[in-house]
Swiss-Prot record:
Function: Endogenous activator of intestinal guanylate cyclase. It stimulates this enzyme through the same receptor binding region as the heat-stable enterotoxins.
Disulfide cross-links: C61-C74, C96-C104, C99-C107
InterPro entries: Guanylin, Guanylin_sf
Positions of the propeptide removed during maturation: 21-92
A family per Pfam: Guanylin
Keyword Secreted: yes
GO CC terms, sorted: extracellular region
Family: Belongs to the guanylin family.
MF terms in GO: guanylate cyclase activator activity
Alphabetic keyword roster: Disulfide bond, Secreted, Signal
Protein name: Guanylin
Amino acid sequence: MNTFLLSALCLGAWAALVGAVTVQDGDFSFSLESVKKLKDLQEAPESKVQGRRKFVAPPLCSFSGFPEELRPVCKEPNSQDILNRLAVIAQDPSTCEICAYAACAGC
């Protein structure tokens, strides 16, 4: 009985920690899952199209699949810089999962 209880407790703690990795950039904090979605958006065919128009927000912000959690970044004057830093993490999220980046917490 004690073994079962201990196993259930450990499994519950592990499940709680799996989704707990957050990525911080300045005052912003995002789940690692939202940051991982940036990689898919960058590889989308519509992200390769570049026009000569000047955008108020970075082109990624206009994509339909852009994570809602990241939308506040699009309103910042340095949004492209923030998204570029998040994109570095999105390219290799495993390094964030083991806390190799200072921006990652909750591993």
